[in-house]
């Protein structure tokens, strides 16, 4: 019988290491697919994305971690705005930017690949920017702004440069 006595023993194991919550697999090799885009006329954004999906599909078949598109890959859509001046045409092209971003996010999820979009014009409150997006395969995204705008982009289109260089975390590595 215990006679209503009790003993509480506690032993602190100095060799115990608590499990970490970080389940990321650190990759030692990262595969990147660079798209060489042929500028040709497109009638609609659907035509552009038929070509975009071709490249995303091809690069993902090689088990690439990233696919990178070139700057102003959507420029052929400006043909619809030939009747406008240069500055107005690039601003009209900016109307497609959010839809393009959303379509890239869907492709990143569908093909399990991180997509770095080519840069595109985006109208913000304080000006017209040249931006691109990192669309991760988990469905999240980040935006980056081109910092060093060319003199011609300033003169012809009135673009504004971004104010900071950013780095982004991905499932493979930090990029920026």
Which residues are covered by each model-predicted region?
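Short polar catalytic/cofactor-binding loops
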Residues: 36-42
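Acidic, histidine-bearing metal-coordination/catalytic regions of metal-dependent phosphoesterases
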Residues: 1-28
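Short, flexible loop segments at the rims of nucleotide/cofactor-binding pockets, characterized by
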Residues: 43-46, 92-96, 152-157, 176
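Cys-nucleophile CN-hydrolase/nitrilase-fold catalytic domain and related Cys-dependent amidase chemistry
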Residues: 45-137, 142
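Beta-strand-turn-beta hairpins that frame and shape the catalytic cleft
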Residues: 21-32, 167-176
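Active-site catalytic loop in hydrolytic enzyme cores
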Residues: 14, 106, 122-176
